[in-house]
Amino acid sequence: MKTKLILLYGGKSAEHEVSLQTAFSVINALDLEKFEAEPIYITNEGEWVQGPLLTGKLDFVEQLRFSATNTVKLAATESEKSEGEAISPAVLEADDQETVVFPLLHGPNGEDGTVQGLFEVLNIPYVGNGVLASSAAMDKIVMKKIFADAGIPQVPAVAVRLIDWKNYQEEMVSEMEEVLTYPVFVKPANLGSSVGISKATNKKELEDAMTEAFLYDRRVVVEQGVVAREIEMGVLGNDTPVCSVPGEILPEGAVATFYDYKAKYQDNNTALIIPTEVDPEILEQMKEYAVQAFLGLDASGLVRADFFLTDDNQLFLNEVNTMPGFTPYSMYPLLWQETGLPYSALIERLVDLAKERHAAKNALKYKLED
């Protein structure tokens, strides 16, 4: 019997369009001899719309943007709209057919533990990280505390709340300028894909960057900028994770002063070097920190660990991403491609890991013996 794979994408998030790109890529890579693919689109307003079962490859991304109607069909041309049925999330409950949810969601309400909590309540297996790892890794402030507790090196940073910024802006700026030196990077605490992130090289730019970041979150983290190589590593597994080869990001020219949203998803000038050259000792340290971060978060399925490596071989873990970009041209799948695990096989491995974790959870006792 085929595994029913529910593909959940879109979402009420600034990363809605990224999620659509990811879903399009995964769906077109699925072996439909092994999977029954069922798309569920979450609109920008948060409405869940179920599309038709997929019997072949999609032609364009817009086919996945369903409008809730009384009919269910895929658009045949880009000028048409795909149609689906408005549903309640409760329909995700597993039936007699083996069912796995693949949440292809980025950002808040997708990779922050909220939708993962729904899957746990429904007791349905799902790809990727659980509630704890998803929520902790989504919050850059909490994540930094976990890494610090594990002894993983990070760049200096200052956390700022909106209420404190409103009431004590001058004092907060002074504190940041005492702890950090320009340039700094200002980031919303709970957002991914570099949305809302700005680089500041002076006080005026810092204040403008804070204003921008607070549009996306009420908590912001300000990090010390470093001149360093940006090297990333994929981690895959459950209790015994393994690491991929390392890859390096090279935004070219003046297009990007850091690896921002445009460089990640819109800019063809961004170069990815996979595998990249790293001293053997540094590479082993990188793997150790990546696994420590994975286990410290109680992660499962997949994580991408992002590092800074300076010219004098100082290594800093910048962050981990529990649902990294997942198109065939994104860093995480490419890392595994070069490690020997092609895109389609990676998807199947993640589904298997979801089943393994779900079986292990259901084998636990949840009732005291009399």
From Swiss-Prot:
Needed cofactors: Mg(2+); Mn(2+)
Classification via Gene3D superfamilies: 3.40.50.20, ATP-grasp fold, A domain (3.30.1490.20), ATP-grasp fold, B domain (3.30.470.20)
Molecular function in Gene Ontology: ATP binding; D-alanine-D-alanine ligase activity; metal ion binding
Q: Give EC number(s), comma-separated.
A: 6.3.2.4
**Domain of life where this protein originates:** Bacteria
> What coarse category fits the chief subcellular location reported for this protein?
cytoplasm
Stored HAMAP family: Dala_Dala_lig
Quote the protein name from its UniProt record.
Answer: D-alanine--D-alanine ligase
Origin species, per record, is Listeria welshimeri serovar 6b (strain ATCC 35897 / DSM 20650 / CCUG 15529 / CIP 8149 / NCTC 11857 / SLCC 5334 / V8)
